[in-house]
Amino acid sequence: SDEIVRSGRSEPDFDHKAGLAELVRRGGPRHVYLAGAYWKDFDYASGFKALSAMGDPEYIYRAGWYWKEFNRTAGLERLIELKNPRYIFYAGLDWKGFDYGRAFQALVSLGDVEYIFYAGAHWKEFDYEAGFDELIKTDRMEYVYKAGCLWRRFDFLRAWKRMEYFVDDGEEWRGRAFDHERWRNALRLIWDELWEREGARS
């Protein structure tokens, strides 16, 4: 398969249609992806159809990033069908014309708080209110803490209450919050407001 890819890239008389058909017959998604990335004459529709059928999310993602022509709507739907939050997240980083809303809903449906956190930290578009509502359901306090460090919008009061609820599992992350400037400043403001309210009542 490596030889077919090299020949399709360098030999002027190479039959690219037959070459792609042979790569598809051999069933290697990496080589179909490489052919689409390097061949000057490539049937992108057939290449995508082959990658989709092979069901390898990594090379669907890579094709969406590097191929000159790629149906990103269909590509995202295939990643969602494959239930792979990692490559849905990666596609949001690197694909042009990406449907962030559709991808976010997929991450929520998959229930993967790790990649909801990563999306909130790194995607160009993200629904922070809905994302926080999903994040706060988790018992994985690491991602609640990290989101407070990196998300542009974050409800520190609700997050802190969540970390207090998990007395033992949240202990490490409450300690880290005190050591992190953004968390520390947010908590100071929250407690100052609470003390002012208590003072006004007394």
Give, region by region, the residue ranges found by the protein language model.
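Ankyrin repeat (ANK) tandem alpha-helical domains that serve as protein-protein interaction scaffolds
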Residues: 1-202
